[in-house]
């Protein structure tokens, strides 16, 4: 039997630092093949190593979505690109740098087994840095798959970071550059700037920041509509053995796509949780505090990643249990869908494989993995005619008509991206 969520009192979360820098205003994804240097690049720009999970540290790969904020600055005395930095004091002239903006980085796992995690993270990205290592032939399977995922989800503000230039010859860097140009031809990244860097040695970080500033602008935000937040992580922040009277409520992590959520607001979480009868019920709770960029704030707005502390029983939020839910004011959220019809646009070839394979038409009774917002669900095809497909979902989603869907099919032992859908 679950404890009543309202019995969980609020005790402030420990905050590691307080800062006067602006709150993050844009979410930028780091995507690309496993071991090409995404996490190292986030650390070079933000000072935060996003692999904190014990298994991640042991295996040396990202498993969960990682998050870190970085404040981009500009030296008033340097010429571009040297003027761009994350340092408060210019290392060349010793003068104070001017703040441009703070960005939130979403570090996606590059391993093929973790594609669903990458798709979930892509739902909250405003733009992306595609990291491609110069010491391997381009494209690698997940380089292809991640770029196609960005295209399917509608992310077209892309910068390419050609990483690891410090461990290859100049000739190899130029050869790899041509491989990248050939690879992105005809894709959403065809005109993306390609910046040669070494994340490990922090080489050309200034040129990369300049490219991000010029290529990935902060989108216009809708602050007046009812709020809608996509949950990308959820936590129980209590240490084992915490006495019941000191337990903290569950924490939701994610990003708002519109509106504002304030401390003290009543919120609804859909689809919610499954009861003993197999029915899904929304959760209702109160916002106890909001953390953004390492500090408490009174309200959450679109742009950047936020943590919302609630009165929910922490067993409901532990281990990312509420990922894929959406949060808003009660009665103002999209419908919960147990099935939907979508207009489908299939790729010509399956991406993520070493060998080429054509995408066959979707068939009746076929299981598909569907990414809708931050939700990943399985759907069984109940009708398939031309480009209109109906699916019955194993786990419901909360989504508006017109929402994009990334569609994956089982190929061998893995789910592979095969196309995009629009909910009708």
Swiss-Prot record:
Its cofactor is Mg(2+). It is an enzyme of class 3 (hydrolase). It catalyses: GTP + H2O = GDP + phosphate + H(+). Residues 107-110 are annotated as: G3. Mg(2+) 2 binds at residues 35, 60. InterPro entries: EFTu-like_2 (IPR004161), eIF2G (IPR050543), eIF2g_C (IPR015256), eIF2g_dom_2 (IPR044127), eIF2g_GTP-bd (IPR044128), P-loop_NTPase (IPR027417), Small_GTP-bd (IPR005225), T_Tr_GTP-bd_dom (IPR000795). One of its GO terms (molecular function) is GTPase activity. GO terms for biological process: formation of translation preinitiation complex. Keywords: GTP-binding, Hydrolase, Initiation factor, Magnesium, Metal-binding, Nucleotide-binding, Protein biosynthesis. Pfam families: eIF2_C, GTP_EFTU, GTP_EFTU_D2. Residues 23-220 form the tr-type G domain. GTP binds at residues 35-40, 163-166, 198-200. Residues 60-64 are annotated as: G2. Residues 198-200 are annotated as: G5. Residues 163-166 are annotated as: G4. Mg(2+) 1 binds at residues 39, 62. Residues 32-39 are annotated as: G1. Heterotrimer composed of an alpha, a beta and a gamma chain. This is Translation initiation factor 2 subunit gamma. It comes from Archaeoglobus fulgidus (strain ATCC 49558 / DSM 4304 / JCM 9628 / NBRC 100126 / VC-16).
